[in-house]
Each structure stands twice: as C-alpha cells, then as structure tokens.
Amino acid sequence: AEDGLCEQIASCGNLLRNYSVFQLPAIDHLGSRVATPLLMKQASSVSRQYGDGSVLSETFGCAGWGVTFERLQWIWGGQSVLGITKPCYHLSAYSIEGRRKRDYPAFYSYQEPWWDEFKSFALWMKNLNTLITEGERELHTLVIPPREGITGNYQDGAHSQDEIKRLSAQCRMLAENLLDMQVDFDEGVSLLGGTSREEQVCPYVFYEMCINSNGTYSL
C-alpha cells in the first residue's frame, strides 16, 4: 500500500478489510524517509487484530547510492516502533551494468562496497524485531478511519478529489497528533464488533476508547 488515502481508495477500496484476510500484511516503504504513520499503523493494526502481529515491509528502496547505515537505522527504527516486524530489502540484482544501476538504488547485494559489513546492521534489525515481538503491545485506543464512508461515496461520484484529499490530510494529522501525545492506537473498521468482549468479532484485542475520524459515515 502507498501512503495516501486517495491512492488506496482508488485502487483498493477499504484496505483494512482487505488486510484482514492476508496471512502476512505488507507495506511498500519507499525513499530515504519515514513515511506517514498511517502506512505502518493500518497493516500492524490488522495483524494484531486478526493474526500474530507480523508485518512485512519492502523497505530501503529509492534510498540512493549514498545512503548510510545510520540512515537505514533511522528508516527501520521509524517503522519498527509502529509495528513493522519483517524486512524485505529493495532490491538485489544479478547485475548493475549499464542502466541497471539507476533502477531505484541502493541495491542490497554483493555489488555494494559495504556488503560484508551489512550483516552487523542486519543483526541489529533482528535484535530490535525480537525485542518488539517478544512482548505484548499495550494500547487502549481504536481509531476508525474514514475509509468506509469515503469508499462508498467515491464510487458514487459524491466526493471530489479535493474533499478526499482534505479528509486524508485530517486523518493523517489525527494519527500524528495522537502519537505526539504518546497515545498509541490501532486502526480498525466497524465490523470489528460491539461494545463488550462478547460482542466483538476480533478475539485478540479489546479497546477502551474509540475515535471516529471526520468523514466516517457508515457506522
């Protein structure tokens, strides 16, 4: 999945519902950056709610030939803290001759001069992932994003692209503000269940507080 709510709705509809039937939810994290928290949160939330908490990330693509271990550590740390547990390096190539060397580098293979030292970084990733997955994440807040309402209206042509972009920005801001206040949360959909443990469909987690995002119409 890509970062923006607009792109997700146009191609996937309600991505959270789709993730719920995945054996291993996954994201595509591109660039020398840490993406909006929604990209990581939507996959890690569904994995906690329906599975074992494992989430795959195709990562480090487009980080550039000059990327450093420190930069890679920052990129992966930003994903791990939001629930990503398994890396899939982007990419490895049989050859980087000619134009191949321009195919969204860096390449995480023997062509890199630092390849022999990469195992130390990989060990750090492994240890960090072990630390995150051995414990049990404790959070009490569920955020219902506006995907369901927007998807229905988007298909009917009732929402303009500008309005969807506005709702997407508000949803991203809500997530960033909650994390800034150190309020961890999951994303979810209304089909998760009711207001008691007996009513909820999802057997793995129970939330004490639910926040409906602006644009959530279908509850």
Q: Which stretches of residues belong to each language-model region?
A:
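Carbohydrate-binding surfaces of carbohydrate-active enzymes
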Residues: A1-L219
